Amino acid sequence: MLTTFTAPAFAGTWYIEDGDITISAGESGNNVTQNKETTVNDHDTIITNREEGASSHTVTIDAKDKDDKVEVTLKDVNIDASSRSEAAVSVTGKGDTTIELDGDNELKSGAGHAGLEHNKTDTSGELTIQDKDNNGSLEAAGGFKGAGIGSAGSNDAQVKITGGNITATTSDDWGAGIGSGSYGTGTVEITGGEINATGGYLGAGIGGGCNGSGNVTISGGTITAAGSDGAAGIGGGYYNGATVTITGDAVIKNASSTKYGAGIGGGNGSDGNVTISGNAKIENATGGYGAAGIGGGAFSSPDKIGNGNVVIKDNAKIDNVQGGAYGAGIGGGIYGLSNVTIEGNTKVNATGGAGGAAIGGGAGAENNSDNNGNQITIKSNENGSPTINAVGGGTDEGEKIVIGGAGIGAGCESNADADITLEGKVTITATAGKDNVAIGANGIEQEFSGLAEGSSITRYDPEGNDITLPTDPVPAVPSSSGGGSADASVQESVFPGLVVTDKDGQRISYTSIRGNNVLSLRVGRFTASLRASLATLRQLRAEGIDTITFQTILCSTSLSVDELLAMGGEDTEVVLTHHIRSSALTVGGKAV
């Protein structure tokens, strides 16, 4: 027999130890049922524990009709429903439910269920978790196939979080920390709070469970998210992709995957579609084995390759992003291509996994069926100009990776092209992995022209030698103060006493850059020779120059002036010749 009490404006505290609780929308408040007794018009429904230990009783919130609004406060609740194979708290119905967090709350559900469960359907309402007083926390653990917060197994999920200190995980496998259980789509919106989410085996930290996709928008809060094997930290679960938007003032402290999933993006064998904008900040994103830090997951089969489609814009900052072995820092997983756009007042620091590009393709990628390779655009706009530091992935003897990745472009053992576009004002430092290029693909350093004043491109080989092309824009000359000379000078023709000749022995012009005690000479040829007498070098040494660097398109050599001066008399000629990637030095006609 069900007993109903009718009362005006009732504010009730309900103790979970007294029995299961069901809450629905009434005419002017909540209808709360416990032990077959219903109280109506409850305007401040608070659910709590009378004692410290966990209760196995559950809470069901049913905003049944489309216009229903149900608001419930969880205050120091501790529910463990794992023995009942039920959800500790479940939210259903076509209407909207808001859960306020007060105090410390713990929810643990049984197999097949989420810790705090909301299964999304075509007609379901919205679940919002909030912490208006900034004094609430929630620890939620799902059972086998269920998310920590989100859906049960084989269901889609919808969750919106606006605040609270929230820790979400699964006590078993296949579910996301926040998002969907297995085989579902996790639709997650986070606008605030301090979030720590860990996926179960094959589940994303935030996004999709096993075989589940992620549809994630984060516009605020501080986030730490870890995906388990095959799943992204933020994004897709095992065997599924993701659409991830990080914007506003969101801070991603760390997003990572143990293996095969991107830090942010796709799960194993899946693409990652990621947009980072506004004032968002990524402090660290790390891809699992074979996956990108931001972008595509690892290769699974010929028809399941993790490509990375990434846009970074506005004032976004990427402090550190690291690809897993074979994966790009930003772009494709192993065998995966990239479509990356970086624009505006952005700052990016990216490193490729062993064999992967820092920004671009994963190792072993091929052009797609339309014969398109990696597409990379870096440009300024009305918001400002980008600053990029890109370090190509190195080698790994244990993985038999003997060639590194490009700083910007293609990964190792890749036949994929790299269509790289630079527009406006850019500041780029790119370091090549072993036997790869700093910026480009297929062994060719790409040249650029028409960039705006103030642009800078600096290229390094893996040993840190400057291999900047003579055609690259150089850093702006520091302005002097107090009438003193600047620290660096640029001369667009020749430096007195130093002659550069082409392959036919004809004199050609070059660019000379003096910075402190180093004189750099740059020429846009594959083959060229630098010629100088020891008398000229002695004069340079008297002016404070102790090192001369000679740079052609694919080769850079540094010479010690003191060592050369010890090799002969004043009239002795020094000739340094570059041909493609090789160099040869003679002093007085003798090879050194």
Task: Please place each PLM-identified region on the residue numbering.
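Bacterial N-terminal signal peptides
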Residues: 1-4
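A composition-driven surface/loop motif
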Residues: 7-480
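Long, contiguous ectodomains of secretory-pathway proteins
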Residues: 46-49, 69-75, 80-84, 92, ...
